[in-house]
Every structure is written in structure tokens, then in C-alpha cells.
């Protein structure tokens, strides 16, 4: 008996252990097997007794009792009758919980089509039957008959007949000579009659025969679905339903409200409609009603079932009493409020609270201040148990009373409970994993949570009213994880870039900066001190100042651990700072013996972390914080309006620029330049002026003044704040005291008239009006882009969520090549910074001696990187996530260093999610940061390259001409200038623009900062290569060229117009030719005539008969006027790259190396072909829309991958032409460019992880002897498995090409249908999965969260491993026992196996 009572409290139903979940279409038999009874009446509950009606939607006989262990009529109550069925009300006596589990069903009087398989595109029923959706609907909704069996009549199989045609055919051929049906029964018969095997063979044969691409695609689609039905065991006729399942009543509750009204789930309404119509149809059939009435009723039944499954997918939306659309079963799953995202992936949490945060500068880094009231509530159960253990209360009720009265002993116990019990703090929005961290609570008075100032950067928190949530980890495992993995002291480095994120900011920085200033000529300069105590004494007695230059004997540690001393010239303040430095040989006093800006402090923290470890770093950070706050308070820095110094030369610069602008205006009036060029030049001049004034202002503010006594005065406090990195930026200072500069219109164009005043002088009304544009745009952008960025993060997380470190080494020899990124002649990302923390893919050798510096397979630390850079290595091949050959996840060697820990990455690390967060988080940060500069225009147009090394110039593909002005001009498109140092190592290479003026030539020596070449960034020239006289071809006034008079100037300039639009000039080919003395067109060296084709909008620079020399400009094409670039261009750009969208006017890329030839024009396109250098290849032809500027001439030589037409290349083209490595390099660089503009650091490996996920699919080009269909996209893994199988069987394997998918598409095509369904397009994903009978292997994170298991990452990964080992061991034991049993037949029965514990 006792045993039975015990069983009551822990029910014996074991948690199900499963490894995979399969989804398929439910057959009518299956639905009946789930059901506990048929629902015959639409009634729900009796409004007087509130008891469910029998056979109704809430029937207790079918679904179970309403109260635990009590039948409906009350005859049997309590436990002892468990399992008895009451004879009066037929209700089983059991737990009421079964009302959440038991299903019912409705027997339909006529079959109906399942709307998902009918309407969800592509229509599965339509594909199988090869009928259009329109025809299907006509049959289903009783408009047309379909011929099933034409017999000997002239009718065709599956011919549609209208009512009249049907009757006519019956009259003509007789009633039994053919079979035609209408409605879902007809479709069901058609589906049942399909012979899938025959159909598959037929389709394969058709595919082999057809030449048409469209037909091939259609057959492939049908073949795919036929195979899906064959392989999954689903029967096509199951897509037509004869039984509708009814979900358990507690999942669609009906709750009585006061006042006799009821709140009900919409599903009840939808089920009621179905039951009503079904019953009516049954009655009509029994009454033998006329066909037309029955048909109408059947149609209405079909509509009712449609609405139940997916309301609004077909016809009008069914609305409830209050005109609100009813939520159907599909809506329950879909969207943010659907089951997946609302309840499975995001759950509400108990044991949590939230409050406003305030700063807690006296806390240690691992602490947070928790209000007593909050702690008392959150830790209640712990307090109760402790009170009980101490004998202070005997019952829970008593304990509750004690706690409610807040007795003194309760506070003591709360202290005990809280000690060493971490809590989690979270600030929304949680953009990356540092948005939730664990702290040890300390109890405080008041009602606000206290937060340590140094973790604010990680949470992106400030104290202007932000709120934070507190969560309590309950189980011991959870507390352990919180302490070991999530404690704030364990998260010192940023997972996105490996830099410290626990970095002082604002006041702390200002205090440390003030502390480290050194000023000449203060009292006590040059005194010598040996101990800190002496310095303190001197400071106290005002013998020296904090900033006085003194000499100091520093006591440090040598490499061997013995104490060493050294003399330094420093200041008292810096010595105070030196006292908090850890004692370590690698961290000398020099580390802080300089002016400490924010960046310097960050560097010191990084050094301390690398050399002294985490504990020391945390202590150092806390000390440095206290020191900073204290000194900021001691310094008492403030500023007034006179601290904003307007530079003296401001008005001179403004007047000069004004006169320049006037000059440009004049040039425009004289017709020398176009409107666009004038605009560009004016904008350029004003932005240069703004820069100049800003520089002068900075010079003046930062200059050190002398006081009357001859010593240095205090530095300007605004400059201190900006220079230290505490607050403000040079851009803001420029607006305060320089000149506000150019403003942008909301469209992104720049207004030509700048704002000359600054905020100190005040703006005029017009200036103020102009500046409102920028401010308004900034605020609007912020709101929009926060949402966009959040969505980008969601897509990234979704595509990468199953990327986990699953092995230590995949053993691949592949890798990608890394070199420094150089932009406009400056190194923006050094080689060292790009390879740090990555694994070398091959031995790295010193170029001069060929000695191995770093052997392959080494994880590169700082020391290795230094050695590589010292040796002058230009290119390093490293392992990458892109080339990792692991089937599931990524291996640790290919990933490299875990950036947040600075150590090799651990097994089970969810690198995909970290990558997604690292890329998404700054997106939101940046989007919120656009309007800080008030829309002040910042233009960056590159117009020169300069050397950043000393060395010698060598030129590859040299082509330089001297034009009639005597200037050297670059005449070829692929000229590369390389700078070689004294050892002959190539330090850097620059590609020179066509038409650039060269400042150096082959063999010149060059100094750092010297210009190599210059060009006009706003125009593209067309140059002549020969000397001679100009002639025009097909340049006909009014047809292909027009003298446009500029209205405002009255000056004519000649512009090529679109000659095809003028009707008469369709066959013209406008060109400029260069003729010799004999009047014939000259020949070029490379072959072909000196004929230069012109494109639309080219502006002529020469006239007929003028003499030209090589390098002279014949015509120029103006490029677009400058637009401002801020992350607005940025975020959509990043999304565009990750979505792999084709850019609007994509570049056209040469698919092969060869010679350009112009062919005959085609309608309104120009035809260009490439004659390949490799004669075995076919020539390639490109049609280029008119108006696109082709900057190549007939006979130019191009390399594979060169641009024929400028623009942004489509990533798919790069993949097809240049391969995966080039594509990855392109995507990484483009995405990094956007973030770099904003000064955001993201490690390349994060972007590589996402790109890897975008390259998971292969398009089958030739199916070989495999089951795959050519033209279909399959998973890489699947593709390889199929090919391995084919090779084993000696068949011909398939070939395929990698396909690049955008992140949304890639997410929807993952192997897990759970993950895809919870992302987007739920209906479509589930329909497809059901038809295919897909199995979800539950490998990713999302799927496991959805089914409620531990995720296979982090600590969950080790659990999964243990489980795997246990399973294997059990299998071995079982096999052993079976062997034994086979040998000894009469052995006693084996005891039951020890199964691994269920999760």
C-alpha cells in the first residue's frame, strides 16, 4: 500500500528519450488511433451547470474528467476509484491532466482537401497530378467535373467539364460509358489511382529526352515530389482528409467570465462551424436532398475545414463576433506570437525581478548591489528551508509569517543564503552573450540595483533610467555554470575581437589622464625620490605638484624573478599609477610612464591579462577604477565657454574658400566644367576648409601655454576630455569651436552652402534651418535601423546556430591566404592582426633565409606574429572555418583561438552563435550612433596614392606616356606599382588608376609619405595612345551628340547623347579617331585602329583637327556626385552581402583571360566578346545595356576576373569565376569595410563562419549514376555521401558546383525542419517536411531547445558525449550477453540493462 502512495507523488511515466523526430502526413487510420471518441455535437458547455455537454467539443467522456479523480456526475470521487469508468456518465476516473493530452475526431460526411497541400506553393497536389492550382480549385469547389475514366468516348483523361458539358456528354455517350467526378472525392480518386513507380520512370525518361530548360525544371520538380512520396511511405490520397482530428480541450480553453459571458479560444468557433456543417451535410444526405444543395453544403464544409487549418489562405478571412479574424491552427504556430517563438524558444522565467540601476563605484568587479526587499522575495524558498533547518519554524506557514514580518533573524539568514550564491543580471536588448552576466549579490538599502561601472560597456548600460532584470540560478549545476562561465570576472575580453571589454571610461579615464600629465617648469622639478612614501609626503607638503617632472627609482622584477631597480624620469601622478601595476617582468614601468588615454589604458589591461592572468587583471581593474574616480574628483575639471577657442585664422580660410567657390562658379559659367563637377569641387573645397579650421583649432586648444612665472599652464579641459577619450570627439569640438561644415539633405546629398558658424558663435536662422535636416534624419534613422539590425542578428543566429566545435582536428590541408589589407596606401589591417590566434596551414618561412619560423599546425600567439612581421612575410596561409572538412560543425584547429578567453577553443563552443552576435551587436550599436555628428557631412574620396614605406619603385605592366603638357600619364589598366625595401622584399603594391598622373617611375627611390600617383576622383578619362590629328566618326549633331547650352551660363559643351533613342541614329557607333599625316586612321601597337568608342554622357575634350599626343584626354565621363557615407549605407550593405543579393547594377566580370572585341550591337544592348588566350576555350559573349560605361577599348587585354563594366560584383559571379577563397576574401573585406568605417573591430573568423553556412549547398550539374537529379540543390554532406556510395558500388559519381545562398534562404534550407519552421514561413516548411517524411536529427541548438533538451553545446556537449559513451558501452555489454546466451542455451534470464539517465 505504501508503495502505491509513493507512486502517487512521483508518477512512473518515464520521460521519453529520443534522438530524432520524424514528421509525416497523418493517415485517417492514424488520426482515429489518436482519438478517444467522435465529436458529434457543436455544443461546448452547459451555460447553467458549467458542465461539458456529452459528445460536444468539451465532452468529459471523450477527453477525461474536469476535476482530478472525480467523475462528472459525482458518483465516484477520490483516488481509490482510479481507472473506473462511471456507468452513469461514462467518464473515466483519472487525473484531469489527460484533458491536455487526449484528442478527439470528427468523421466527415464528405472528404475535403487539406489546404496546406493544396495552396501552399508549390501546390503538392497540383505537382503530383500535373494540374494547375486554378483547375484543382474549380474541381474542389464544385465548378467543374473531371474525367477519371474516359472509356471509349472522345473525352480525354483528366479533362475538365462544366455542368452543361457534363450533362451533354452523358446524353451523347450514355451514363455508364465514362466516369467523371466532382469535388474532393474526384481528387482523392485521382491521387489514389497514381502509380508512383511508373510515374517516376516516366519522368526520368522525359527528363533525359527534353532539351528545353523550362521543361527540365518542371520534370525535376515533379520527380522530386514523386520520390518524396515513395521514400517517405506517405500515400498521396492522405492529402485529402476524411477525418479531422480535434485537439485536446485544455489547449483551446473556454473560461467563464463574470456576468455570464465566456472567453473562448478561436479554435472552438472554427471547430463548431465544421461540426455544424458536417452534421447538416449528413442530414441532407439522409434526406436525399437535391444535388445542388448537397454540393453547396460540401463546398461550405471544405471552406470550414480550410478556415480551421489556415484561416485566410483561401477566400475571405472568417471573423469572429468583433470583426477580428479568427486564429486558426496555422496561426498558432506562425510568427512572433506563435507557439515556436513565443513558448518554445522564449519562455517566461520564475525567480526573477527587475529594477532601475544605479552606479556602484565601491563594489568589486564580481559584485552587484541587490536591494534587500528584492533579495528577500527572490530567495524565499532558500530562506524557508534554512529557517526549518535551524529549527526557527516548523511549518512553511510559520516560516512565511516570519518572513512577512521581516524579523531580524530573517535578515541574518538571508545574508547566509545569499553568500556565494550568484545571481544573473540582464539588460535588454541582449545583443550578445555579455548582456547576461553573473554577480555575487551584496545586500543594500533602497530599491535600485547597483551595477559595477566597468561592466557598463558590456551591457551597453548607462544610468539615465535603464532597468535590469535579476534571475536566480536554482540548481547546483546552474550556480556552478553561473560562477565558472558567466561571472563578470570571467568575461574580460570581448568575444568579437579579443580586446578587453572591462575598460575604464568617462570619469575614470579623465582621472587617470589627469594623473599622468607631465608639465614643464613646475615647483620641485628634477627632485629625486626613491620611495612612494617620500613622494606622498612631498605632495602633501606641496613641495611638488602631481605633474612635476621628477626622477624616481622603480622597484621591479627581472626575468629570473629577482628584484631589479631602475631610474625613470616621471611624475608623482604616474608613480601613484605605477603602484597598482602587478609585479611582472613583462610589465615594466614604461607601460604607464606616458600620457594615459583610453586606448593606452586598454593596452595595459590587455598586457596584464596576457602575462599575469585573470585574477591579477580583475584586481588591477578594480584598483585602477578607484584611482581614476578619486583623481577625477580631486582634479575638479570643468569647462566654461572660453575654453572653446575659435582659431584666429578661421575667417581667412573661410574667405579663401569663398573665393575658390566663386571661381568654380565662374568656370562653370564659362563652360569649362559641368554642373556635377562644379558641385563636387565646391563640396570638396568646403570640406577641406572645415578640416583645416578643425586642425588649427585643435592646434590652438592643445598647445601648451606658459604662465607669467614661465611654467606650463593647465591644459585646456575640453581638450583633456576629448584627447583622453573620456567624452566628446574632435568632430564635436570642431562643431563647438571650429566651423560646423557641410550638412546633408535627408536624401543623403550634401548641401553646397556650408554652415560657417560654430555653436559658440551661434548659427544664423538659415544655418539653423539647414542643420535641422541632419538632426531629423539622424533620429528617424535610429528608430528604423534598430529594428533592421535586430532582424539581421536574428537571421545570422538562425543560419549559424548549429555551428559547434565538434572535434579537435579535421586533418585538412586546405586553408586561405591572408595578407595585410591596404586601402588608399594606408595599412588598415596588418597581417599580424589578421593571423593572430589562427592556425598555420603550412610552414611559414623567412623569405630571405627560407628558415621555418612557424611550423604548420601551430596556433599563432603574439610571439609568433611578431616573428612573422619582423621577417617581412607578406602572405600567410592559415586554416579557416571555410575550408574545415568536418561533417558536422567545425574543428578547433580550423577555428583557432577562443577570442573571449585567449586560449585554444574548447569542444562544444557554440561558435556560430558567437559569430552571429559579434556581427549583429555592433549593427545595433552603430545604428543607434548615427546622429552623434548631427548629419555633418563627411566625404571620403580617394584621389591619390602615397607610399607608406621608404624603398625603391618597381612597376609591373608598365604603360606610361608623356602628354602634351609634359605630364606622365598611366596608360594601362593593370599597372601595379610595387615598393621594394633594401633587402629586395616587396613591402606593398598599389594598383594605379587609368589616366592617373604618375609622380614616380621605375627604379626611383621613394620616401615614406611621397605621392606615387594622383587622379581626379570625379571623372573617368578616355586617353589617346598615339600622336596625330583628331577626327570624329558618327558624331552627328542632334543624333549622337548635342551641344548643350547650360541655361545658367550660356556656354556650350558637347555631350554624347543616347543615339538609339533618336530614331534616325540607330546604327551609329560614335567614336573619336586619331589620324596620321596622310589622313588615315592610325594603327595601335596592340593591333586594331586608333578608334575610341564613346558611351552616353561622355563629354568631349577635343575638337576635329586638334593635335594630340599620347596620354591626352579625348573625352571624360563624370562619375556620380559624392554622397555621405555613414552606417546607413552600412547596415543595408551588410545585409545585402549576407543575403547574397545581386546588386542593382552589377559589375560584369570577365570569365576568362583574353582580348576584348566589340561585336554588332543588338537592339539596345552592346555586344562585347572575349577571345580567350587559351585557344581550347570557347569565346565568351556579353550583352551590355546602353548607358553603361564600358571603359575598355577594342583590343584591350583582360585577365580572368577583371571587370568589363564597373560596379559592385555579384557574389555569385565571384564564386563561379574565381572560386570559394576569392569569394570569402571579397565578402570578408566588404563587410569589414563597413564596420571599419565606424571603427568597430570584428575578427575575420566570425564572418568566415557565417559564409561557411552560406556555402552548404551544391547544385548537381551531372547526376552520374546517383539518385540525385541534375539541377537540384542538395546539402554538401548529402552530396558527398551519395557520391561515396556510388564509388563503392563502382558507379559514376555526380558532379556539382557550390552554390551561394543568402542567410534567409540558407536558414530555411537547413537539415532541421524544426529550426527552419521556427524561423520563417512556418507553413511552407512544415508542409514540405511532412511530404518528404523528414527526420530531424536534433543536432543544432534551436531544435533541442524546442523539444526541451539540453543543447549540444557547452556543458550540454559533454553530457551528450557521456550519453554516447554509455550507449556504446551498453550495446557492447548487450552484444556480449547475446553471444553468451547463444553459446549457453539454458542460461538464467539476464537482469535488465542500465539505460543512461533520461535528460
UniProtKB/Swiss-Prot annotation:
Cofactor-binding details, from the entry: Binds 1 Mg(2+) ion per subunit. Binds 2 Zn(2+) ions per subunit.
EC class of the enzyme, as a word: transferase
Pfam family, one: RNA_pol_Rpb1_4
Family note: Belongs to the RNA polymerase beta' chain family.
Any single Gene Ontology cellular-component annotation: DNA-directed RNA polymerase complex
Protein keywords: DNA-directed RNA polymerase, Magnesium, Metal-binding, Nucleotidyltransferase, Transcription, Transferase, Zinc
Keyword match Transferase: yes
Organism field: Afipia carboxidovorans (strain ATCC 49405 / DSM 1227 / KCTC 32145 / OM5) (Oligotropha carboxidovorans)
SUPFAM superfamilies xref list: beta and beta-prime subunits of DNA dependent RNA-polymerase
Protein's UniProt name: DNA-directed RNA polymerase subunit beta'
Catalysed reaction, written as an equation: RNA(n) + a ribonucleoside 5'-triphosphate = RNA(n+1) + diphosphate
Amino acid at each position: 500500500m505504501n508503495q502505491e502512495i509513493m507512486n502517487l507523488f512521483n508518477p512512473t511515466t518515464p520521460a521519453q528519450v529520443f534522438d530524432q523526430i520524424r514528421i509525416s502526413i497523418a493517415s485517417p487510420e492514424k488520426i482515429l488511433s489518436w482519438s478517444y471518441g467522435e465529436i458529434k455535437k457543436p455544443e461546448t458547455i452547459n451555460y447553467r451547470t458549467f458542465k461539458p455537454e456529452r459528445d460536444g467539443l468539451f465532452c468529459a467522456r471523450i477527453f477525461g474528467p474536469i476535476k482530478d479523480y472525480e467523475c462528472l456526475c459525482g458518483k465516484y470521487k477520490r483516488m481509490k476509484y482510479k481507472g473506473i469508468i462511471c456507468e452513469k456518465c461514462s467518464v473515466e476516473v483519472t487525473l484531469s491532466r489527460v484533458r491536455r493530452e487526449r484528442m478527439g475526431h470528427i468523421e466527415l460526411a464528405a472528404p475535403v482537401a487539406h489546404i496546406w497541400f493544396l495552396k501552399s506553393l508549390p501546390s503538392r497536389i497540383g505537382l503530383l497530378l500535373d494540374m494547375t492550382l486554378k483547375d484543382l480549385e474549380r474541381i474542389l469547389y464544385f465548378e467543374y467535373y473531371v474525367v477519371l475514366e474516359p472509356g471509349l468516348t472522345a473525352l480525354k483523361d483528366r479533362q475538365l467539364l462544366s455542368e452543361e458539358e457534363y450533362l451533354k456528354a452523358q446524353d451523347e455517350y450514355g451514363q455508364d460509358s465514362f466516369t467523371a467526378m466532382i469535388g474532393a472525392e474526384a481528387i482523392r480518386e485521382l491521387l489514389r489511382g497514381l502509380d508512383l513507380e511508373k510515374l517516376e520512370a516516366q519522368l526520368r525518361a522525359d527528363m533525359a529526352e527534353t532539351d528545353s530548360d523550362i521543361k527540365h525544371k518542371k520534370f525535376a520538380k515533379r520527380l522530386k515530389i514523386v520520390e518524396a512520396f515513395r521514400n517517405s511511405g506517405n500515400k498521396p490520397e492522405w492529402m485529402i482528409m476524411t477525418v479531422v482530428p480535434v485537439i485536446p480541450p485544455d489547449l483551446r480553453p473556454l473560461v467563464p467570465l463574470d456576468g455570464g459571458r465566456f472567453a473562448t479560444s478561436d479554435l472552438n468557433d472554427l471547430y463548431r462551424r465544421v461540426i455544424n456543417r458536417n452534421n447538416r451535410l449528413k442530414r441532407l444526405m439522409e434526406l436525399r436532398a437535391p444535388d445542388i444543395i448537397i454540393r453547396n453544403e460540401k463546398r461550405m464544409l471544405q471552406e470550414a475545414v480550410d478556415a480551421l487549418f489556415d484561416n485566410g489562405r483561401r477566400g475571405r478571412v472568417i471573423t469572429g463576433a468583433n470583426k477580428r479574424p479568427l486564429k486558426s491552427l496555422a496561426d498558432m504556430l506562425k510568427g512572433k506570437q506563435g507557439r515556436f517563438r513565443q513558448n518554445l524558444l522564449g519562455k517566461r522565467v520564475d525567480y526573477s525581478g527587475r529594477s532601475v540601476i544605479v552606479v556602484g563605484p565601491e563594489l568589486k568587479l564580481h559584485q552587484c548591489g541587490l536591494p534587500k526587499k528584492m533579495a528577500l522575495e527572490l530567495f524565499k524558498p532558500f530562506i524557508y528551508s534554512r529557517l526549518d533547518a535551524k529549527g526557527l519554524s516548523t511549518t512553511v506557514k510559520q516560516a512565511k509569517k516570519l518572513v512577512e514580518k521581516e524579523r531580524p533573524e530573517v535578515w541574518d539568514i538571508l545574508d547566509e543564503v545569499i553568500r556565494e550564491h550568484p545571481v544573473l543580471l540582464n539588460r535588454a536588448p541582449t545583443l550578445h552573450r555579455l548582456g547576461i552576466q553573473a554577480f555575487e549579490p551584496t545586500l543594500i538599502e533602497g530599491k535600485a540595483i547597483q551595477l559595477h561601472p566597468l561592466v557598463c560597456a558590456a551591457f551597453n548600460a548607462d544610468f539615465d533610467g535603464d532597468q535590469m532584470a535579476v534571475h536566480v540560478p536554482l540548481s547546483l549545476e546552474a550556480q556552478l555554470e553561473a560562477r565558472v562561465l558567466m561571472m563578470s570576472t570571467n568575461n574580460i575580453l570581448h568575444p568579437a575581437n579579443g580586446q578587453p571589454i572591462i575598460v575604464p571610461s568617462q570619469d575614470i579615464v579623465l582621472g587617470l589622464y589627469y594623473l599622468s600629465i607631465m608639465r614643464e617648469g613646475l615647483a620641485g622639478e628634477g627632485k629625486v625620490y626613491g620611495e612612494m612614501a617620500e613622494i606622498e609626503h612631498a605632495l602633501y607638503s606641496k613641495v611638488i605638484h602631481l605633474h612635476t617632472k621628477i626622477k624616481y627609482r622603480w622597484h621591479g622584477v627581472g626575468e629570473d624573478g629577482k628584484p631589479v631597480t631602475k631610474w625613470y624620469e616621471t611624475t608623482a601622478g604616474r608613480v601613484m599609477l605605477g603602484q597598482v601595476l602587478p609585479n611582472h617582468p613583462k610589465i615594466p614601468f614604461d607601460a604607464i610612464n606616458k600620457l594615459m588615454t583610453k586606448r593606452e589604458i586598454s593596452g595595459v589591461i590587455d598586457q596584464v591579462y596576457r602575462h599575469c592572468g585573470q585574477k591579477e587583471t580583475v584586481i588591477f581593474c578594480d584598483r585602477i577604477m578607484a584611482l581614476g574616480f578619486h583623481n577625477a574628483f580631486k582634479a575638479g575639471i570643468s569647462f566654461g565657454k572660453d575654453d572653446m577657442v575659435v582659431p584666429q585664422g578661421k575667417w581667412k580660410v573661410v574667405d579663401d574658400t569663398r573665393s575658390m567657390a566663386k571661381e568654380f562658379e565662374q568656370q562653370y559659367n564659362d563652360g569649362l566644367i559641368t554642373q556635377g563637377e562644379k558641385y563636387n569641387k565646391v563640396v570638396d573645397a568646403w570640406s577641406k576648409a572645415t578640416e583645416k579650421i578643425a586642425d588649427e583649432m585643435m592646434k590652438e586648444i592643445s598647445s601648451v601655454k606658459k604662465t607669467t612665472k614661465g611654467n606650463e599652464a593647465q591644459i585646456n579641459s575640453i581638450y583633456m576630455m576629448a584627447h583622453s577619450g573620456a567624452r566628446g570627439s574632435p568632430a564635436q569640438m570642431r562643431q563647438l569651436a571650429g566651423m560646423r561644415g557641410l550638412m546633408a539633405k535627408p536624401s543623403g546629398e550634401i548641401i553646397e552652402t556650408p554652415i560657417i558658424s560654430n555653436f559658440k558663435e551661434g548659427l544664423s536662422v538659415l544655418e539653423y534651418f539647414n542643420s535641422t535636416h541632419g538632426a531629423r534624419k539622424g533620429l528617424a534613422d535610429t528608430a528604423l535601423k534598430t529594428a533592421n539590425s535586430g532582424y539581421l542578428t536574428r537571421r545570422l543566429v538562425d543560419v549559424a546556430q548549429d555551428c559547434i566545435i565538434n572535434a579537435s582536428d579535421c586533418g585538412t590541408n586546405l586553408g586561405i591566404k591572408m595578407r595585410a589589407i591596404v586601402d588608399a596606401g594606408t595599412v588598415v589591417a596588418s597581417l599580424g592582426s589578421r593571423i593572430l590566434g589562427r592556425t598555420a596551414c603550412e610552414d611559414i618561412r623567412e623569405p630571405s633565409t627560407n628558415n621555418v619560423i612557424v611550423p604548420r599546425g601551430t596556433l599563432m600567439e603574439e610571439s609568433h606574429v611578431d616573428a612573422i612581421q619582423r621577417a617581412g612575410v607578406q602572405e600567410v596561409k592559415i586554416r579557416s572555418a571555410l575550408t574545415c572538412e568536418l561533417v558536422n560543425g567545425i574543428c578547433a584547429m580550423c577555428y583557432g583561438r577562443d577570442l573571449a578567453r585567449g586560449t585554444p577553443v574548447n569542444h562544444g563552443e557554440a561558435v556560430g552563435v558567437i559569430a552571429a552576435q559579434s556581427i549583429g551587436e555592433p549593427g545595433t550599436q552603430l545604428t543607434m550612433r548615427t546622429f552623434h555628428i548631427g548629419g555633418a557631412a563627411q566625404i571620403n574620396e580617394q584621389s591619390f596614392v602615397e607610399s607608406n614605406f621608404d624603398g625603391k619603385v618597381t612597376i609591373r605592366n608598365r604603360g606610361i606616356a608623356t602628354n602634351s603638357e609634359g605630364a606622365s600619364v598611366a596608360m594601362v589598366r593593370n599597372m601595379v606599382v610595387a615598393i621594394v625595401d633594401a633587402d629586395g622584399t616587396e613591402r606593398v603594391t598599389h594598383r594605379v588608376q587609368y589616366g592617373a598622373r604618375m609622380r614616380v617611375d621605375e627604379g626611383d627611390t621613394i620616401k615614406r609619405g611621397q605621392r606615387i600617383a594622383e587622379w581626379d576622383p570625379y571623372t573617368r578619362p578616355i586617353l589617346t595612345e598615339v600622336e596625330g590629328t583628331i577626327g570624329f566618326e558618327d558624331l552627328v549633331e542632334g543624333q549622337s551628340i548635342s551641344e548643350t547650352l547650360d541655361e545658367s551660363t550660356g556656354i556650350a559643351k558637347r555631350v554624347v547623347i543616347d543615339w538609339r533613342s533618336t530614331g534616325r541614329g540607330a546604327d551609329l557607333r560614335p567614336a573619336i579617331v586619331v589620324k596620321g599625316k596622310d589622313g588615315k586612321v592610325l594603327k595601335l601597337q596592340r593591333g586594331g585602329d586608333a578608334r575610341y568608342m564613346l558611351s552616353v554622357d561622355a563629354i568631349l575634350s577635343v575638337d576635329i583637327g586638334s593635335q594630340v599626343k599620347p596620354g591626352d584626354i579625348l573625352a571624360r565621363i563624370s562619375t556620380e556626385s559624392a554622397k555621405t557615407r555613414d552606417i546607413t549605407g552600412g547596415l543595408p550593405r551588410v545585409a545585402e552581402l549576407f543575403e547574397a543579393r545581386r546588386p542593382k547594377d552589377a559589375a560584369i566580370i570577365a570569365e576568362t583571360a583574353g582580348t576584348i572585341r566589340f561585336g554588332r550591337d543588338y537592339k539596345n544592348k552592346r555586344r562585347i566578346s572575349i577571345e580567350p588566350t587559351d585557344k581550347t576555350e570557347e569565346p565568351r559573349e556579353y550583352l551590355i545595356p546602353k548607358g553603361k560605361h564600358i571603359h575598355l577599348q577594342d583590343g584591350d587585354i583582360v585577365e580572368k576576373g577583371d571587370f568589363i563594366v564597373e560596379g559592385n560584383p555579384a557574389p555569385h559571379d565571384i564564386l563561379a569565376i574565381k572560386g570559394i577563397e576569392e569569394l570569402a576574401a571579397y565578402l570578408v573585406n566588404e563587410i569589414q569595410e563597413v564596420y571599419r568605417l565606424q571603427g568597430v573591430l570584428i575578427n575575420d573568423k566570425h564572418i568566415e563562419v557565417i559564409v561557411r553556412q552560406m556555402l552548404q549547398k551544391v547544385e548537381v550539374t551531372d547526376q552520374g549514376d546517383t539518385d540525385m537529379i541534375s539541377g537540384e540543390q542538395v546539402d554538401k554532406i548529402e552530396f558527398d555521401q551519395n557520391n561515396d556510395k556510388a564509388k563503392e558500388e563502382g558507379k559514376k559519381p555526380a558532379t556539382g558546383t557550390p552554390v551561394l545562398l543568402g542567410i534567409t534562404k540558407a536558414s530555411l534550407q537547413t537539415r532541421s525542419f524544426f529550426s527552419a519552421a521556427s524561423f520563417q514561413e512556418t507553413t511552407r516548411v512544415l508542409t514540405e517536411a511532412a511530404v518528404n517524411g523528414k527526420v530531424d536529427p536534433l543536432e543544432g541548438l534551436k531544435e533541442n531547445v524546442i523539444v526541451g533538451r539540453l543543447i549540444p553545446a557547452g556543458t550540454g556537449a559533454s553530457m551528450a558525449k557521456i550519453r554516447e559513451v554509455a550507449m556504446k558501452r551498453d550495446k557492447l555489454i548487450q552484444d556480449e550477453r547475446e553471444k553468451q546466451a547463444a553459446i549457453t542455451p539454458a542460461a538464467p534470464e539476464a537482469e535488465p540493462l542500465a539505460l543512461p539517465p533520461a535528460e
